[in-house]
Amino acid sequence: MEQQEKNEIRLELPEKVRQIIEQIQKHGFEAYAVGGCVRDSLLGRTPDDWDITTSAKPQEVKAIFPRTIDTGIEHGTVTVMMGKEGFEVTTYRIDGAYLDGRHPESVEFSSNLVEDLKRRDFTINAMAYYAQKGLVDVFEGIEDMQRIVVRCVGN
């Protein structure tokens, strides 16, 4: 699928997710829904949760929103509270070596969305979305979903 066609894909973001993304963008940063919520939406499923990735650093995210929780701030993750709901907002990052298979020994914050998507496990989870930009799918996750293939990013 060509990038032009991917840009024409429209997903319905929950109102609170849209508000978080727009608020971050209003402050001059990039922000996208990312990962499993994008995959599930493309498959017509209702996501269990919505994750957001951003070029804003954790302290910048905390300065934008009145209610946040330091969920995993050393890994760039802040939970933004919207009413009683929490949404994880994570800074673009490049992960160091994984010692336990799940948590990186070190992280380096980045300002590049593609660098952040590279660290994800599977191509079908390495997609990001926001209405004004459309779908960002540099690792052909849609094609893998259509072929019913689970492929690691980088393979």
Where are these regions (language model features)?
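Catalytic cores of the polymerase beta-like nucleotidyltransferase superfamily
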Residues: M1-N155
